């Protein structure tokens, strides 16, 4: 019992010494710097994002925002080992599975946050 208490106490002392805390000025600087970085990244992402749909089903695309339609997504198909992306709505030949797939596509489009 005493040995386990000594081991725990020693571990805590080592942890306190090994991980010194930052002073408040350094912490404030880190927060400001990280907020500026996040704001820059968000602005860049918003600028690079397509604003409206421009492709119909069957046409080549690079992301979901380019495809027109609530259930149309930019899907990947591999032909001879090469990835080809095109706008697609149909997910299955089975009618029931196709409806479920289109619902999943609609959720995926909503998550894409296209303007």
From Swiss-Prot:
Similarity comment text for this entry: Belongs to the neurotoxin 25 family. F7 subfamily.
Question: Which organism does this record belong to?
Answer: Cyriopagopus schmidti
According to its UniProt record, where is this protein located?
Secreted
Q: In which tissues is it expressed?
A: Expressed by the venom gland.
Is Secreted one of the keywords? yes
Q: Which residues does UniProt assign to the signal peptide? A: 1-18
Task: Report what the protein is called.
Answer: U7-theraphotoxin-Hs1a
Summarize the PTM comment.
Contains 4 disulfide bonds.
What residues does the annotated propeptide cover?
Answer: 19-51
* Alphabetic keyword roster: Disulfide bond, Secreted, Signal, Toxin
**Gene Ontology CC:** extracellular region
Any one Gene Ontology molecular-function term assigned to this protein's record: toxin activity
User: Which residue ranges traverse the bilayer?
Assistant: none
């Amino acid at each position: 019992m005493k040995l386990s208490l000594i081991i725990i106490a020693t571990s805590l002392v080592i942890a306190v010494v090994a991980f010194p805390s930052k002073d408040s000025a350094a912490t404030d600087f880190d927060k400001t710097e990280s907020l500026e970085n996040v704001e820059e990244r968000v602005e860049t992402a918003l600028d690079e994002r397509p604003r409206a749909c421009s492709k119909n089903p069957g046409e080549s695309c690079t992301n979901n925002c380019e495809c027109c339609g609530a259930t149309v997504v930019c899907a990947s198909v591999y032909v001879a080992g090469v990835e080809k992306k095109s706008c697609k709505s149909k997910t299955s030949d089975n009618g029931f599975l196709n409806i479920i797939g289109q619902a999943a596509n609609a959720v995926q489009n909503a998550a894409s946050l296209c303007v």
